[in-house]
Amino acid sequence: MPLPTAYRANGGVWRPSCARAAAMTGRPILTAEKMRAAEQRAIDGGATVEELMEQAGAALAEAAYRFAGPTPSLVLCGPGNNGGDGYVAARHLAARGIPVRIAALAEPKSEAAKWARGEWSGEVETLSESTEASPLVIDCLFGTGLKHGLEQAVSEQLARLCNRAIVKVAGDVPSGVESDSGVELSEVPHFDLTVAFGALKPAHLLHSAMHKCGRVVLADIGIEAESDWREIEAPQLPPLDPGGHKYDRGLVHALAGKMPGAIALAAKAAALGGAGYVRVSTSRPIEGLPSAVVQTDTAEVNDERIGCLLVGPGMGDIPQVLTLALTSKAPKVIDADAITHLGEPERLKGQDAIITPHGGEFRRLFGEIEGDKPERAVEAARGSGAVVVYKGADTLVASPDGRLGFRPPAPAWLASAGTGDVLAGVIAAMRSRGLPAFEAACAGVWLQGEAARIAGPEMIADNLADAIPDALAEACSRQQ
């Protein structure tokens, strides 16, 4: 059989003809340090701190008004610039004729916050046990850069006022949250809305803070937010060649092991995820596979047409399967038991691999890497040369070149047996279709989350796989 044109044209290295690099275009995510640098660039360009504060506070007021309408409001202001944003927000809400009160934790300390306090013409209460509740509470006590929990008395008053409010809004990040790690440094109430100033922060998409933010909206405050860390958005899928054939759409070759159910889920997901041809090497027939998935008793891992090799789901204690996979020059998705049998990350170098560990598998393979989850993910990818899909409630996708994708909040019902097998299959399909490794992993992560939303809370992994075509349709509709 003659090799496809795309193979011959790429110097004997198989890449489907639809292959093209896809830029990461999701919303940028800035750490506290990078946010300060972005603000400083704006200031160096002629903006003032007061102008940035005015834009942040005005945006906070606008978002709160759109969310809650003309609701009597209580703005809680801290001593720093986050408190200054609160003074500005209160002024803009009052200008709409909304009854507004301010309760301050302390007098402003920064010059910009003092300016914002001076622009407020109303009274300022002291935040205390006697502070009366309000239907709308806006939290501007502390923002990014917080490194310690709130004092107990402050935490108690924040909780009391939020518990009695109808609507709770946070400015930038909820007070008590460490913005870079998503860790709750002290008790954090559940907010209905969080208004991120200038850029998303890691905490907006990291466990456990993400679950306290409610809906997160992004406010433009006039800064240029550039980052290699971005929110994963709907994938830009490569167009199909009208004159192409199944190999142009990508061949996924999966290696079965002891537990056929897992590889069956992964292979089904790869087929439903758009791969043109899915093949499973198995020593015995696997029941329940779609008829379109080819079962073979030979492991043709060096077939030059393979767009992606999938190994790990259901592999069990058969390390020889992984050893065989690592002899192939094809791009790989390495999941589940295969991750455990890697033993050391050095085996990934030169493999063009995507690995998909959950927390336990990550620690067993990479050890105790220092830093927050994003830093650990990036370091693991750099050290191994593989794209790392660090799974969890806050799944991250890390590239060896330092790029990091944060999955948007996904349904909690994804925490179910077999959903990781489906994810591995979808990523393999995306890789076989020609997306580069990082983009393929991000695409698979987004599609899995969207499929879970479509499948609903009663889903099992089989339903998740069945929903992949609808998730693909949603991604395509967003491209138009």
Summary of predicted features, one role per range:
Residues 18-105, 193, 199-333, 340-354, ...:
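Small-residue (G/A/S/T)-rich helix-start motifs and N-terminal tracts that mark the onset
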Residues 136, 141-229:
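Internal gly/pro-rich beta-alpha loop/helix module
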